[in-house]
C-alpha cells in the first residue's frame, strides 16, 4: 500500500496518493518531528515513513488503517548495514511496543539524563526506548543532539 494510488484522481486526472497525503498530515501535526527520536523531519523528500503503533503484521486491517494508530517517523538510518546504527522503526521492525508517544502514562515515565540519553521509570517502556527503538543510538548522535537541545535552553 505504501505510495500506491487510491484509485481516485484529482480534477486534472492525476492519481491521489493517499499514503503521501496521510504522511504529510502526520508530519504537519507533529511539527516536523519524529515521534520517537524527535529529530527534525524535512517536509520534502523521502525522509519519513508512517509507523504503526500496533504493527500491521500483528493487527487487523481495520486497525492498520486507523489514523490513531499512525505516527510519522524519520528513516532511522534504515540503509545502515548494522542494526546498532539504526533507530526508531528501522530498528524496531515489527516488535510489539509498550511505549506509546500518544499516551500520557508513557510521557510521564520519560526521563532525560544530563548526557542526553533517554530512559524511563517504567521498565517495559525503558526497554522499548533503549533496546527496541534504540533511541540512545550513538551512531546517529541522538544523545548528543538531545544534550545540545537541552543546553540551548
Task: Indicate where each model-derived feature is located.
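Short, charged surface segments at domain edges that flank catalytic/cofactor-binding sites
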Residues: 1-36, 59-65
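Histidine-centered nuclease catalytic patch
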Residues: 39-87, 92-93
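Short Fe-S-cluster ligation motifs
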Residues: 62-78, 102-120
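A contiguous binding-surface segment within folded domains or other stable secondary-structure elements
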Residues: 81, 85-112
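C-terminal, charged low-complexity interaction regions
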Residues: 124-153
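Short, well-ordered strand-loop elements centered on a beta-strand within folded domains, enriched
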Residues: 82-89, 116-128
Amino acid at each position: 500500500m505504501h505510495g500506491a494510488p487510491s484509485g481516485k484522481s484529482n480534477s486534472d486526472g492525476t492519481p491521489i496518493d493517499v499514503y503521501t497525503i496521510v504522511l504529510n498530515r502526520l508530519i504537519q501535526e507533529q511539527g516536523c518531528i519524529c515521534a520517537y527520536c524527535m529529530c527534525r523531519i524535512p517536509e520534502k523528500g523521502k525522509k519519513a515513513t508512517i509507523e504503526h503503533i500496533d504493527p500491521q503484521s500483528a493487527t487487523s486491517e481495520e486497525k492498520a488503517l486507523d489514523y490513531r494508530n499512525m505516527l510519522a517517523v524519520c528513516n532511522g538510518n534504515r540503509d545502515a548495514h548494522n542494526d546498532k546504527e539504526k533507530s526508531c522503526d528501522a530498528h524496531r521492525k515489527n516488535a510489539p511496543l509498550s511505549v506509546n508517544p500518544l499516551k500520557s502514562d508513557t510521557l510521564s515515565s520519560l526521563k532525560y539524563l544530563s548526557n542526553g540519553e533517554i530512559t524511563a521509570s517504567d521498565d517495559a517502556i525503558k526497554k522499548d526506548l533503549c533496546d527496541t527503538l534504540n533511541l540512545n543510538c550513538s551512531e546517529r548522535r541522538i544523545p548528543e543532539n538531545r544534550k545540545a537541545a537541552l543546553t540551548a535552553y
